[in-house]
């Protein structure tokens, strides 16, 4: 037991639900994109837009949470995920590739907010337990690795005549679950230094440690996306 354990557990379960939704979209997005797209070369566009959504949202999410608090930002993110899942389900029902792409962008935005769960976990615990708190939250990915793909398979035939619409409806339920959990998180306001002078971006990006971190993260994420996107398409031929 450690200080802030309740908050950390809520964030860990929220992480598991969020990543399960993202993993499901990774597994199905390119396959269904190939079915809906007017040109098969656009099959992976939904996944690309999901990644772009995460990247574009990350900075605004940080700014929003800086002034309105972590919980408000997390609830907004989960709401975007819920809307994105419903939009994807509607897109499949209407056979609309454009709506399917937009839905995945919203799901990516959900992840952009949720990537801050681990930092909130650190803020909710004593410094001596920070590493354990981060580990618990990141461990949600282990659950997602199993739940995400199974969710897609489980819901594929929920709606007669609309293959995989049920999968995205089930995905929406994950976001609702995350909303319920996140509404119970109690975090202290983020301390904002009154006379803080921000460093120039040039100075920040000149740090070798930051450069190595960005390069490593970019390579790792690119390989992960490539494998998770291309494999389902290759299996189906």
Residue spans of the language-model regions?
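Juxtamembrane intracellular "pre-TM" segments in multi-pass secondary transporters
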Residues: 1-5, 185-216
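Helix-loop junctions at membrane interfaces in 12-TM secondary transporters
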Residues: 5-6, 90-102
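Short amphipathic helix-loop junctions that connect adjacent transmembrane helices
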Residues: 28-40, 229-237
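C-terminal ends and interior cores of transmembrane alpha-helices
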Residues: 79-94
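Cytoplasmic helix-loop-helix junction between adjacent transmembrane helices
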Residues: 101-140
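C-terminal membrane-cytosol helix-exit motif in multi-pass small-molecule transporters
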Residues: 148, 152-153, 172-191
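Extracytoplasmic gate region of multi-pass secondary transporters
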Residues: 210-237
